[in-house]
Design a protein with these regions (language model features):
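Noncatalytic, basic helical substrate-engagement surface that gates or grips nucleic-acid strands
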Residues: 2-142
């Protein structure tokens, strides 16, 4: 017999926060806050996260949820192949100061903001997915 207050199965939602950030950045015109700090990606990111949270709440959403971000720097893939993403440009200058604000906004949603030096968000998402599935959890990746 199951407890009425407990879900039948844990359901983990993993949000590709890096994907959200870049989509928000390229989707909106440049915006700044009253101090002149770029804020367009922050606005777009939080709007998308708010909509996701609202939709999930209305649908009796996940039992667990986390936002996964890329951490700047090299990854283990660079050690395996020195030219890995060698042609990829750095993030736009006006996006860089928004990263800490986006982390802060994520925490304001009471969501963990997970990032690990040496690993891309995709690698972390894959690891969390494998661990959750091994425990019998359902996993949804939001990208």
């Amino acid at each position: 017999m199951s407890d009425q207050n407990q879900p039948e199965q844990n359901h983990l939602y993993l949000v590709d926060g890096s994907g959200y950030i870049f989509r928000a950045y390229h989707q909106l015109p440049p915006l700044t806050n009253r101090h002149g700090v770029p804020a367009g990606a922050v606005y777009g990111y939080t709007a998308m996260l708010w909509k996701l949270a609202k939709d999930l709440h209305e649908a009796d959403g996940p039992t667990h949820m986390a936002v996964i971000l890329d951490k700047s720097g090299t990854t283990f893939r660079n050690d395996l192949y020195e030219h890995y993403k060698a042609n990829r440009p750095p993030p736009p200058e006006d996006l860089v100061p928004q990263f800490p604000l986006i982390r802060e906004a994520t925490r304001a949603f009471s969501l963990p903001c997970i990032e690990e030096q040496g690993f891309e968000a995709d690698d972390i998402i894959a690891s969390y997915t494998m661990a959750a599935v091994a425990r019998g959890w359902q996993v949804t990746i939001v990208s």
